[in-house]
Curated annotation (Swiss-Prot):
One GO biological process term: biotin biosynthetic process
Protein name (record): 6-carboxyhexanoate--CoA ligase
UniProt source species: Bacillus licheniformis (strain ATCC 14580 / DSM 13 / JCM 2505 / CCUG 7422 / NBRC 12200 / NCIMB 9375 / NCTC 10341 / NRRL NRS-1264 / Gibson 46)
InterPro entries per the UniProt record, alphabetical: BioW
Classification lineage: Bacteria, Bacillati, Bacillota, Bacilli, Bacillales
Keyword entries, A-Z: ATP-binding, Biotin biosynthesis, Ligase, Magnesium, Nucleotide-binding
Catalyzed reactions per annotation: heptanedioate + ATP + CoA = 6-carboxyhexanoyl-CoA + AMP + diphosphate
Pfam families: BioW
Length: 261
């Protein structure tokens, strides 16, 4: 990838105005592509934003900018699926997994108690495992993991090797989790989607990999959750900067051809 210029392409879509003016979040997306791939990336993100089950957006922003920093290659987390028959079972297993990842049970309990407060947060909440408090200071904005991509050809090879369906939702979620858990300050991630039609969620951690729970909420529920359990004694500002700004490719082998399509 030396000598090749890459661009970070980002999309956000909302209903009833922009997010910062109280609009309802509909969709978002990220790509990292060379100049020749910009048209396809913008078209793909436009289609994603216009066809989401959360509603029809009346505001959409698609922007791109040149990536000036070296792009880091991060290996995808290993994946495991846990069949859960109810939201209660799924969330109970999530609590157990987060504790196994190294988060004190008291902090896990406090985080789950505060989930209802975080439903309006557009990005992720950073939660200190020592104090049991939110520490990102971003209010409704939260922390948006950005500047990442998983080239399609590499993702297809990975999915075939792991024997999992190569669906775009898994690709996006695992890419985010892999970048997040690569950071040394992050102990674990808890996530489930705000998509009312998608009830699967996950816990991710360096120690545990990407642990999917097949049911984490009820059908029709538009509330989502994304919490990063972090070591608050680390440099939190640096952690946020890396999650938002460090360009990352997920994958085993990344080359120019696989990134274009």
């Amino acid at each position: 990838m030396k000598g090749e210029a890459y661009y970070s392409v980002r999309m956000r879509a909302s209903e009833n105005g922009p997010h910062e003016e109280g609009g309802k979040h509909i969709s978002g997306g990220e790509r990292l592509v060379p100049f020749i791939g910009l048209n396809d990336a913008v078209s793909d993100l436009l289609e994603k934003g216009m066809s989401h089950s959360r509603g029809r957006p009346d505001f959409m922003q698609i922007q791109f900018d040149l990536v000036n920093e070296p792009i880091k290659l991060v290996q995808p987390l290993r994946i495991e699926t846990n069949e859960t028959v109810s939201a209660e079972e799924g969330q109970a297993l999530a609590r157990e997994l987060i504790s196994r990842a190294g988060v004190p049970e008291s902090a896990v309990e406090k985080a789950f108690q505060g989930i209802a407060e975080y439903w309006g947060v557009r990005g992720a909440v950073l939660f200190d495992i020592h104090s049991g408090r939110r520490i990102d200071g971003r209010k409704e904005k939260g922390v948006r993991v950005s500047r990442l991509d998983w080239p399609e050809a590499d993702f297809q090879r990975w999915a075939a090797l792991c024997g999992v369906p190569p669906n775009p939702r898994l690709k996006e979620a695992l890419a985010i989790a892999s970048k997040v858990c690569e950071h040394p300050a992050v102990i674990a991630e808890l996530c489930w989607s705000d998509d009312p039609d998608y009830i699967t969620g996950y816990v991710a951690a360096k120690k545990l990999g990407y642990q999917r729970m097949t049911k984490m909420k009820e059908h029709g529920d538009e509330s989502g959750c994304r919490i990063f359990f972090v070591d608050g004694s680390a440099d939190v500002k640096s952690c946020i900067d890396d999650l938002e700004k460090q360009p990352v490719f997920i994958g085993q082998e990344v080359n120019h051809e696989s990134i274009i399509r």
